[in-house]
């Protein structure tokens, strides 16, 4: 039986009832495959800067980059909910710019957008949600702030950080966010956040107590050069690709390819 389209309502109704599984995808073929695998949500993440484009952080990723990849994923017509990251400096400059840029992502095929931050972006989230653009929040570690943080560090270890993250969660919920990604915080804190809000929480590197989980596809399938410590590798696709291409190269060098079944005289 063909599965139904996953909606914002599905996410909201999942709170405390069923686990939500999300993963990233950045192009048509992988979007099709992960959707066939049954994920509930696909995130076109600005992580594409690191795992696809070769940058050392997500900061160089532009809105143009995101629009190209969102459109590619949308062409797969996934049953999963399609969420798009808002890249660095496409929303921090104010609600007006955020609305303009978020609307471009929606027109490209996204069904929700995800800016990073808490209290400091509440006005932006309010503006987007009032305009009818669904927003998934992102608290804890904000990779777009790696320069300020001095690296990708676990957040929420100090009492001040803990209070801030709890306040961020409530503020984003009140601003209209339909879900929250909680990244790289202690599991106990993620549990506190999950129990303090009525919207679903999605953990990445934050333990088992959220309403769902998300990982970067390239980490899951073994394509990442330096996966984070919290990412589980479920396959070694890098070896499969390397071996396949090596076999192809060898057959070309040895004049074994193309063999008769692959051409006509």
UniProtKB/Swiss-Prot annotation:
Entry's cofactor comment: Binds 1 Mg(2+) ion per subunit.
Listed pathway(s): Cofactor biosynthesis; coenzyme A biosynthesis
Residues at which Mg(2+) binds: 46, 85, 116
Cofactor needs: Mg(2+)
Enzyme Commission code(s) on record: 2.1.2.11
Binding site for 3-methyl-2-oxobutanoate: 46-47, 85, 114
InterPro entries in alphabetical order: Pantoate_hydroxy_MeTrfase, Pyrv/PenolPyrv_kinase-like_dom, Pyrv_kinase-like_dom_sf
Cellular location(s): Cytoplasm
Disulfide bond sites: none
Active site: residue positions: 183
GO molecular function terms listed in the Swiss-Prot or TrEMBL record: 3-methyl-2-oxobutanoate hydroxymethyltransferase activity; magnesium ion binding
Gene Ontology cellular component annotations, sorted alphabetically: cytoplasm
UniProt keyword annotation of Magnesium present: yes
Pfam families according to UniProt: Pantoate_transf
Keywords: Coenzyme A biosynthesis, Cytoplasm, Magnesium, Metal-binding, Transferase
Catalytic activity, reaction form: 3-methyl-2-oxobutanoate + (6R)-5,10-methylene-5,6,7,8-tetrahydrofolate + H2O = 2-dehydropantoate + (6S)-5,6,7,8-tetrahydrofolate
GO biological process: coenzyme A biosynthetic process; pantothenate biosynthetic process
Entry function: Catalyzes the reversible reaction in which hydroxymethyl group from 5,10-methylenetetrahydrofolate is transferred onto alpha-ketoisovalerate to form ketopantoate.
PANTHER family linked: 3-METHYL-2-OXOBUTANOATE HYDROXYMETHYLTRANSFERASE (PTHR20881:SF0)
Family of the protein in this entry: Belongs to the PanB family.
Subunit relationships: Homodecamer; pentamer of dimers.
Protein name: 3-methyl-2-oxobutanoate hydroxymethyltransferase
Lineage: Archaea, Thermoproteota, Thermoprotei, Thermoproteales, Thermoproteaceae
Recorded name of the encoding gene: panB
């Amino acid at each position: 039986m063909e599965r139904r389209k996953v909606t914002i309502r599905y996410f909201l109704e999942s709170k405390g009832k069923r686990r939500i599984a999300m993963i990233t995808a950045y192009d048509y073929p992988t979007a099709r495959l992960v959707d066939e695998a049954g994920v509930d949500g696909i995130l076109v993440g600005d992580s594409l800067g690191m795992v696809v484009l070769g940058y050392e952080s997500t900061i160089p990723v532009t809105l143009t980059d995101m629009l190209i990849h969102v459109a590619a994923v949308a062409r797969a017509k996934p049953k999963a909910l399609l969420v798009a990251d808002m890249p660095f400096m496409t929303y921090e400059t104010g609600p007006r710019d955020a609305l303009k840029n978020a609307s471009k992502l929606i027109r490209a095929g996204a069904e929700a957008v995800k800016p990073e931050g808490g209290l400091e972006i509440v006005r932006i989230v309010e503006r987007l949600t009032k305009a009818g653009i669904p927003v998934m929040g992102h608290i804890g570690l904000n990779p777009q702030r790696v320069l300020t943080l001095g690296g990708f560090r676990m957040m929420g270890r100090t009492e001040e950080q803990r209070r801030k993250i709890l306040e961020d969660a409530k503020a984003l919920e009140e601003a209209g966010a339909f879900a929250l990604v909680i990244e790289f915080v202690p599991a106990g804190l993620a549990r506190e956040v999950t129990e303090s809000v009525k919207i679903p929480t999605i953990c990445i590197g934050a333990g088992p107590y959220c309403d769902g989980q998300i990982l970067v596809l390239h980490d899951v399938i073994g394509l990442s050069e330096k996966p984070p410590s919290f990412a589980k590798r479920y396959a070694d696709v890098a070896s499969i690709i390397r071996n396949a291409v090596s076999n192809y190269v060898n057959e070309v060098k040895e004049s074994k390819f193309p063999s008769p079944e692959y051409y006509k005289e």
